Amino acid sequence: MTEETVQPLIEFKNVSLDYGETKVLKKVDLEIEEGKFYTLLGPSGSGKSTILSLISGRLQPTGGDILIEGKNVNSLPSNQRKVNTVFQNYALFPNMNVYDNVAFGPSIKGFSKKKIDQLVKSMLKLVKLDDFSDREISEISGGQQQRVAIARALANQPKVLLLDEPLSALDYKLRKEMQSELRELQQRLGITFIFVTHDQEEALAMSDWIFVINDGKVEQSGSPVDIYDEPINHFVANFIGEANIVPGVMKEDYLVSFAGKDFKNVDAGMRTNERVEVVIRPEDLDIVVPSRGKLQVTIEDQSFRGDSYEITAIDDAGNEWAVQATNPAKIGQRRGLKFDPEDIHIMRLNESEEDFDARLESYEGED
Ligand SMILES: Nc1ncnc2c1ncn2[C@@H]1O[C@H](COP(=O)(O)OP(=O)(O)OP(=O)(O)O)[C@@H](O)[C@H]1O
């Protein structure tokens, strides 16, 4: 039986964008399905907003193809795409009240007054601003402005909502609140959200699927859990959460050597004695008495994080380990580090997802 393939809502095939000599996007492939929450996560300048501009039609690619519902839209104007964007600065009309801001899109489309009214009221209800219709934009808070911007975009009834760092102007608490509100809104509406952020915590908390973008390329894509637990390379491991990354050698299947010792692990399929990078997350390390530790360390530093202590320890081979611990430690003390085989994650050196797959295929072909 063949599995039915779902046509992606949006596809990027080998999409490049150059500004003269500057290559901003380098042969990007993406697939976006209907009804999910996607996040483009990457550092400043990596090309996230450029990808949104290509989806919305504000920019055209210099190479490759962009497809929406299977049709090439490389040169389809923005206003003919069922896509709307919520910008970082909200871009609200300051001279209009809340109601008129939301009514703007539907009025341009020539809908009847009654239909516009219904639409605006339901959108304002959706973002919990039904009592704020008559307020001027200057009379509402940042978080409320953010909601108006979302209601305004949704009033255009898009298939896809693009959100370009929409929470970055909010304070920590409001930002957290809006994260769950946005997530809930997306689930309720069932439309596709593509959210841009450089905040990994935000991406992990909100998304069904994350694209990690770096230097105009997709470094890795996957569910938040996949990306956190199985980062494909040094960049992703470092960018997504805190990671201890030390050099190692895969001696054989399920046996890795690092910090001068051999450890059982759960990875297989690499060459004998292949050089690798070993990743262990700070929360997967426990500080114990030296005799119970798999590695012996000296406590170098510690800082209080509110709900935990971040401890820095140095092993006898000179590797530095960040440990997230519930109890404080004493600087200068000799301790042990404990971890389980499944907490050891192995990364091949400088390997892209494509190279990794190609190598895996050739490995499987050798049987
Ligand atoms: N008109 C332009 N000419 C030349 N380079 C440009 C132009 N517009 C953008 N760039 C470059 O393209 C790169 C990607 O920009 P983009 O805005 O997509 O990044 P980003 O990941 O969204 O960053 P941020 O998180 O800071 O918004 C940047 O290095 C930027 O300097």
Swiss-Prot record:
SMART domains according to UniProt: AAA
GO MF annotation list: ABC-type polyamine transporter activity; ATP binding; ATP hydrolysis activity
Compartments (UniProt record): Cell membrane
Keyword list, A-Z: ATP-binding, Cell membrane, Membrane, Nucleotide-binding, Translocase, Transport
Enzyme Commission numbers on file: 7.6.2.11
Source species, domain of life: Bacteria
Top enzyme category: translocase
Reaction(s) this enzyme catalyzes, per UniProt: ATP + H2O + polyamine-[polyamine-binding protein]Side 1 = ADP + phosphate + polyamineSide 2 + [polyamine-binding protein]Side 1
Disulfide bonds: none
A GO cellular component annotation in the UniProt record: ATP-binding cassette (ABC) transporter complex
Residues annotated as domain ABC transporter: 10-240
Entries under PROSITE patterns matching the protein: ABC_TRANSPORTER_1, ABC_TRANSPORTER_2, POTA
A matching Pfam family: ABC_tran
Its job: Part of the ABC transporter complex PotABCD involved in spermidine/putrescine import. Responsible for energy coupling to the transport system.
Subunit architecture: The complex is composed of two ATP-binding proteins (PotA), two transmembrane proteins (PotB and PotC) and a solute-binding protein (PotD).
Similarity-based family: Belongs to the ABC transporter superfamily. Spermidine/putrescine importer (TC 3.A.1.11.1) family.
Name of the protein in its database record: Spermidine/putrescine import ATP-binding protein PotA
Organism: Oenococcus oeni (strain ATCC BAA-331 / PSU-1)
Species classification: Bacteria, Bacillati, Bacillota, Bacilli, Lactobacillales
